[in-house]
UniProtKB/Swiss-Prot annotation:
Pfam families: SKI. The keyword RNA-binding does not apply. It is found in: Cytoplasm. Its cofactor is Mg(2+). GO terms for molecular function: ATP binding; magnesium ion binding; shikimate kinase activity. This is Shikimate kinase. PANTHER family: SHIKIMATE KINASE, SHIKIMATE KINASE 1, CHLOROPLASTIC. Catalyzes the specific phosphorylation of the 3-hydroxyl group of shikimic acid using ATP as a cosubstrate. GO terms for cellular component: cytosol. Keywords: Amino-acid biosynthesis, Aromatic amino acid biosynthesis, ATP-binding, Cytoplasm, Kinase, Magnesium, Metal-binding, Nucleotide-binding, Transferase. It comes from the Bacteria. It catalyses: shikimate + ATP = 3-phosphoshikimate + ADP + H(+).
Amino acid sequence: MRNLILVGPMGAGKSTIGRLLAKELRLLFKDSDKEIELRTGANIPWIFDKEGEPGFREREQAMIAELCALDGVVLATGGGAVMRDANRAALRAGGRVVYLHASVEQQVGRTSRDRNRPLLRTANPEATLRALFEARDPLYREIADLVVETDERPPRMVVLDILERLQQLPPR
């Protein structure tokens, strides 16, 4: 397995589960959003404020292409990374893709106090999460080798599930 790539909505647990998977697999962990922040010296909300979502998505596309070209990485992506065709192609080519599925209710619970999510600065974050989920869910599924449920499951349980199911996948 070249890389293990985690996709899914905000609050699905991509970063938490990614760190645990990297430790288990003895691989390097990378978070595309954190890498963008390190490179720019600015946080994601600031980038959204200054460059808008299109500016951020340009940075994200370049970062995903770079990270997917590596070997031996567990990569956690931003929730909207799948919206661009080029990103989906890079993610699919970059390794095994695991879609961490979380219900909108679970997403609301996990993101309600997080001020670092510019797309949720709305009057109704739950409605925003629902709309994002409806637009993105088919795209996550399109590129996923595995779909793993994260609702009401401790991260370690999700990690064990992923590790077990990865072994059952045919080579590609």
